[in-house]
Amino acid sequence: MKIKPAMAAMTAAAAAAIGVAAAPFASADDVEVQSLGQPAALTDGNLVQHWTITGLKPSTDSIPYRPIGTLWEATATDEAIAGGATPIVSNLNARAKNGDTYRVLFGVATPQGVNPSTLAQGEKTTGKIYFDVTGATPDSVVYNAGGNDLLLWVQPPPAAPAATCAPEPQT
């Protein structure tokens, strides 16, 4: 039996589509969510690193980059918990509630930035990361690798109001 080239192409395309449809996708359940200021674990086999993001805010720093929008900053810490770790700063993004996402300005080297050198177990590096915000105000930072959100830091919930005690009546 001879298969016509067009039929073979359609069969291959259908098989590829089924393979893509059946491929696993990362879901929101796969994302570790923490409040800004709390560490989030990034695990790759036996290697574990903790990223902590704090202080997401508009920046007044002078860096060798002219933003199109407003320059924002956060402080990032990466700690090698188990095994060595290489801080991949380029995977960090600021994100707004409406989904606007701003890639970290990883190509703009600054003295106050995160050192991208490999860390030995127990070592950590801390520095500022910057974003050019051209739309909605960011309220979170996400660590995204290969199109999948892995870690997410959000604004902490507001503190509960302090309980007030009425003074006891005097007798």
Spans of model-derived segments:
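Conserved functional micro-motifs across diverse proteins
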Residues: 2-171
